[in-house]
């Protein structure tokens, strides 16, 4: 049995050995929830890699977006080159979900484009988990809590072939079709097979190579893997497993039973609509469902077949869907990266999904079974996980409560770098003061990050700096993913010197070239100026030996005071450690390729609708810090906060402080939208 073996030229240093020891003891001692509080640049990923090696548990690493997931995937593959490191994120290049808007009578049809490379990696992840090996790490986004096929059915459809096995060629071909491979006589693509005499070639759906099976009569004579383009033989095997070409696999008998059950439920729902005098909805449901059933009978699938997944999975109404977690063994370890953002995401997915589907069901576009094609609820997710390690520089109250206040700290950086000092300066003439600091920083050969409160402020400040011949760009939620990647690359390579953003946390930026982080209007309390947000923002300067933070404010808020106090505490501990061990802080040198070489994995093209500028208050919800803050509150607390925010907005408008009023308006709309999506 393969075991995890960590490959690294470095050994744990600073706080890492003690953090690793405590976490390993916790895992082996059966502690369910642990929290690792690690400052930016302290090597949290390296520590978790050591924990994985020492505990030898299959591990799910959960990240809150594709960009950070791809970074983690790259790092874990380097740490564990001899083990199975897999990647599981949403495979949509863009996705417009099906929806119905009753107020305007608008039906929006589902529209999507699937990234074949990511689909291959998803299949590779599930295949690895069912392979019997325990040395498996899967790096996943929140996509892992959404429904996929039943692992039992998936496992039943695995085809095992052995040299000398007696099986007719046609019997193997039938098995391949049942595992959702399709026969081709033309182009040989992933998920297809071709037949040439007594030779069957199968292009595996989850790999870059194909399998060639040679027959001698009804006996398998030889099994090889080949290059699908050249036909060159790569390896020869005595036996091999061929995993299904799709996560949703259903046998013929099950399909016929499902069709009958769907028909019965359709009749009941149509009768209910008619009894309520809603004949239009009843007619609509009957026509749409009948069309889907005809497609299933003819082709074995239909558009939107996921809305019938409850039948195919043999689940009861209301029963949770199968997801990636079902493919793991019971003793797997969950590592939640940036937990202060990721955990609230888990809780937020169900409410938004359900509110959209309820409208479809109520107006006859879908059967009630569509409601069971959903992400996990937070309590379902929690119930499926045996042991969790939360990893964050700023753990939220949820993690601290679950860990019963016991936190493993990792404050010392292997490079000896200290937390950046924070200086508070007045808001008056803040832009002029900032420009002077920018020029000094550029002369030193470093880069600058500036965070503002609104998109408009970011764009206007960026244009103003450009007029002063300061090379600059801006980032916010309306800038496309690939454009953001290009902008970050330009910053690192010195094409631009200044990057302005509404909130730079969502990029997961590790930028050693940045020595100055400026926080404009730091005293404007809210989502983007909370203690956790300010701490995370300050951390962007923690990878540079000359890193520093400027907060422009006319008063020191509670959030600012907490951030400054905690930063000072950490600096004292770091300085004492460096002095005791004779360490001189060293500049971090990070490859510029780490993120960008993964660009084919993280490409996200917004749908035509999503690409339009968001209505006021919607874009702010895309920020994980905002989403995390909102979802961590209960309804009563949110309602109080909404009342207070509305009063502040009205006061700002009366005082003609329109920029502040606009910011508060956006926050209010964000809260109203979030609360509307919560389940009652």
Describe every region a protein language model picked out:
Residues 1-5, 440, 576, 580-663, ...:
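Acidic, low-complexity intrinsically disordered tails
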Residues 1-593, 600, 649:
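ASCE RecA-like P-loop NTPase motor cores
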């Amino acid at each position: 049995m393969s075991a995890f073996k960590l490959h690294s030229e470095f050994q744990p240093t600073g706080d890492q050995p003690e953090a690793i020891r405590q976490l390993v003891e916790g895992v082996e001692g059966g502690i369910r929830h642990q929290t690792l509080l690690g400052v930016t640049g302290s090597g949290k990923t390296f520590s978790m890699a050591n924990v994985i090696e020492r505990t030898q548990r299959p591990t799910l690493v959960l990240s809150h977006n594709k960009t950070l997931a791809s970074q983690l995937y790259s790092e874990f593959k380097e740490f564990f080159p001899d083990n199975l490191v897999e990647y599981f994120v949403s495979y949509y290049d863009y996705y417009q979900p099906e929806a119905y808007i009753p107020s305007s009578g608008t039906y929006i049809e589902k529209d999507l484009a699937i990234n074949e490379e990511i689909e291959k990696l998803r299949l590779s992840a599930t295949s690895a988990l069912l392979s019997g090996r325990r040395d498996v790490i899967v790096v996943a986004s929140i996509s892992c809590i959404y429904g996929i096929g039943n692992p039992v059915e998936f496992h039943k459809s695995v085809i095992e072939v052995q040299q000398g096995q007696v099986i007719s060629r046609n019997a193997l071909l039938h098995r391949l079709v049942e595992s959702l491979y399709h026969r081709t006589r033309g182009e040989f693509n992933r998920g297809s097979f071709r037949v040439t005499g007594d030779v069957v070639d199968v292009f595996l759906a989850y790999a870059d190579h194909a399998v060639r099976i040679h027959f001698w009569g009804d006996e398998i004579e030889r099994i090889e893997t080949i290059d699908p383009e050249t036909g060159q033989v790569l390896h020869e095997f005595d036996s091999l497993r061929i995993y299904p070409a799709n996560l949703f696999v259903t046998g013929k008998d099950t399909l016929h039973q499902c069709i009958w059950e769907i028909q019965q439920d359709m009749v009941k729902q149509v009768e209910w609509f008619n009894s309520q005098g809603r004949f239009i909805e009843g007619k609509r449901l009957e026509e749409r469902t009948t069309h889907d059933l005809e497609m299933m009978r003819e082709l074995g699938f239909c558009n939107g077949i996921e809305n019938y997944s409850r039948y195919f999975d043999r689940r009861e109404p209301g029963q949770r869907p199968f997801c990636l977690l079902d493919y793991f063994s019971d003793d797997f370890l969950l590592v939640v990266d940036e937990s202060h953002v990721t955990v609230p995401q888990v809780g937020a997915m169900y409410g938004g999904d359900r509110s959209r589907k309820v409208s479809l069901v109520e107006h006859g576009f879908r059967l009630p079974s569509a409601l069971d094609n959903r992400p996990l609820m937070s309590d379902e997710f929690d119930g499926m996980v045996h042991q969790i390690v939360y990893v964050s520089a700023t753990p939220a109250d949820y993690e601290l409560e679950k860990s019963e206040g016991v936190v493993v700290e990792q404050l010392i950086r292997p490079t000896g770098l200290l937390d950046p000092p924070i200086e508070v300066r007045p808001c008056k003439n803040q832009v002029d003061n900032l420009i002077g600091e920018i020029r000094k920083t550029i002369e030193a050969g470093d880069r600058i990050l500036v965070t503002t409160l609104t998109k408009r402020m970011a764009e206007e400040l960026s244009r103003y700096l450009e007029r002063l011949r300061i090379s600059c760009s801006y980032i916010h939620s309306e800038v496309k993913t690939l454009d953001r990647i290009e902008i970050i690359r330009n910053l690192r390579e010195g094409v631009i010197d200044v990057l302005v953003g509404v909130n730079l946390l969502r990029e997961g930026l590790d930028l050693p070239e940045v020595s100055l982080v400026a926080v404009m209007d730091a005293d404007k309390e809210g989502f983007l100026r909370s203690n956790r947000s300010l701490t995370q923002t300050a951390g962007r300067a923690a990878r540079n030996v000359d890193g520093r933070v400027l907060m422009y404010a006319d008063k020191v808020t509670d959030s600012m005071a907490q951030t400054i106090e905690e930063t000072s505490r950490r600096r004292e501990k770091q300085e004492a450690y460096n002095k005791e061990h004779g360490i001189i802080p060293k500049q971090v040198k990070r490859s510029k390729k780490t993120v960008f070489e993964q660009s084919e994995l993280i490409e996200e093209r917004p749908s035509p609708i999503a690409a339009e500028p968001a209505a006021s208050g919607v874009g702010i919800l895309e920020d994980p810090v905002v989403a995390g803050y909102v979802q961590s509150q209960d309804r009563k607390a949110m309602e109080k906060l909404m009342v207070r925010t509305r009063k502040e907005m009205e006061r700002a408008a009366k005082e003609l402080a329109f920029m502040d009023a606009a910011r508060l308006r956006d926050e209010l709309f964000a809260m109203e939208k979030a609360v509307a999506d919560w389940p009652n």
